[in-house]
Amino acid sequence: VETSIGTLNFTDGVPSRDTADKVYDFMDTSRAAEAFLQGMPAASLAALIEGAHSLGAVEAHQVMLFDNLMNAKSLFLTGNSATVYVVPDLDLKRDGPTVVDAPDGLLGAANDGCFRFITNLGLAGKYLFLPPGYEGDVPEGYTVFRPKTYRVWVFLRKTPKNKSPEVVAQAAQEIREGLKVYRLADAANPPAMEWISGTDEAFNTIHYNNAEFYHHMNKVIQYEALGLLTPGVRGLFASLGIEKGKPFNPDDRMKAILADGVAIGNAQARSIVWYPRIDKNMAGAQIYPDTGSAWNMAYMGRNVHFNGEDGATMNTDARVTFHYPYTAVTPAMAAPREGTGSDYAIAFLDGDKKPFDGSKTYKITLPKDAPIANFWAVTIYDTQT
């Protein structure tokens, strides 16, 4: 039988040993590529947390704050230089039930360890996050959430009226005075908050894009609850030797296959992002459909769960289109309601459907009378980071 991987030989339907070996190489390589795409959300969130930890924001009350805005020294998949970001992360395995006491005036949300939306934190209040399987007492006075994972990433931002140093400093100070993060066990006497500045710091929050990705995912899987991944995705990683409670020691053959698989997975992700198949499963990607415009939505069809029109069919390409270049999941980022909502338009190609070239000059034409209540920004990102 002639195929794209060569000639496959059978006798009475039984494959030859050489054919079986060839097929297994194909199976393992394709599974490695798919594992890269399926594991990307978890790897990306873990990398965000590890980036903050590298600056010293390790304990619950140690929180990274971009007190003088973000700049290109810090490697983030997304972010802008117009808002003051503060990004607590919670470790419910280490700390048990944990409280985020949020003030008024912040916008943001909490995501679990696989970048699934948990809740918005747009209103002042005490948000209590319980570990998976928690059966202890739950005190009154909290808004309670039970994420599927031990790790929870919280992203909050405050928008200063302008970017003058005084106004930005005031916004950062209001965050310092209002936001508290602590273990529920310390609720009677929470430790003083420690603010770690992320501004002008060179550190990385982007997940691995080489074969180290699989070792990183093994570390995440070993630490996390089973709810991190679906049974099917857990099985996918197990087929590569990555399974909770077991060592991951790929032999030379598998090392070569993983290196090949992650390279193919990267190529898949970049192809999906730059050239979405809008005539097929990415038909809802365009901001201006039927116009030939290159502007696309961050969330295909403004669906932050990527679960299709019926709410039950996962669009894996739509999920890759978001998680490969972006971070932070909340319905509020795909709700263009005038006066209260927000929306994002992304262009990976110019008006002629060609990749942007840093040696050329481009012009953006904005729609007339676009509704802007809080702020708007145009942000340029590096195609590699």
What are the residue ranges of the model-derived segments?
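A compositional/structural signature for long, glycine/proline-rich flexible linkers
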Residues: 1-385
